[in-house]
Amino acid sequence: MAADPGVALPASSEASDNKAGSLLVFNYYNSDSSNAEMKNTTISVTNTHPTRSVIVHFFFVSSVCSVADYKTKLTQNQTYSVEVSDIDPDISGYILVVAENSDGLPISHNALIGDAYIRDDAKSVNLSAMAFSADWGVIGTPIPGALTTSSTVTANFSSAFGGYNKLPAAVALSSIPSRAAGDRTMLVLNSVGGDYLASAGDGTKAVFGLLYDDAEQAASFNLSFSCQYARVLDDTTPRTVPRFSTIIPAGRTGWMRLYGQDGTKGLLGAMFVWNIAPNGKRQGAHNLHHLTLTSVATSATLPVFPY
């Protein structure tokens, strides 16, 4: 089979939902086993490589940091889709997907893409997975220094040889609508470092934020979370002075900047927008904009076991 035309994206190109990678992050999923038709998430992962198969290791991380995982094999050009209600019902959180070999070691396989179709009573939206390239060796090469005799391996988001692309340090939500006409905005933040053998997250993350009106005036706020923060923005969340509805009144928009207070831990996330009014037409979702990258590597400890 002929290769795709054009020039391949370099492994050093930063994490994006518009490229393929060796590690994917789905920033949000949820489901309700008692009402799966109305509240559920369908995730899809595609192996875009034309000749090589790959093992994909899924880590489902709940908002309170508990981890459940499983693996499957994707042949060349294969797409795998699953309803979350069938495998991890009644949980919300994020999903980490890692390309591995049959021994359970992460490998360079910058050919994975993914999408999540998320629906509930208020909205039905598509959210692409964030892709992180492996920056080492040719395709199929295990992560440097990893041993099949080890029970764990460390994955570094370092943008250096032997690691994956860096995580964002500062992120932004753009075009936040006013609540006055029924528009609602949900902010999702994720911390993807930590130990995936027991409980993910790299400690409680203190986040500093700025909410701007459309005249460049800002109000600051603070929030904290461990693995995932998912809240609808209103006059109490986050707490600003003046309140959200004053900063973004009827007919106006604003935006938000967020970053970890220690300046080193990475953030990922997404924003969802919908309208609660009858026949409200506004709905959509996208991953947060990345403003800066971390100055130091964030690491994740992953279990090693064969497929």
Which role fits each region the language model picked out?
Residues 2-307:
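Gly/Pro-rich, tryptophan- and cysteine-flecked surface segments typical
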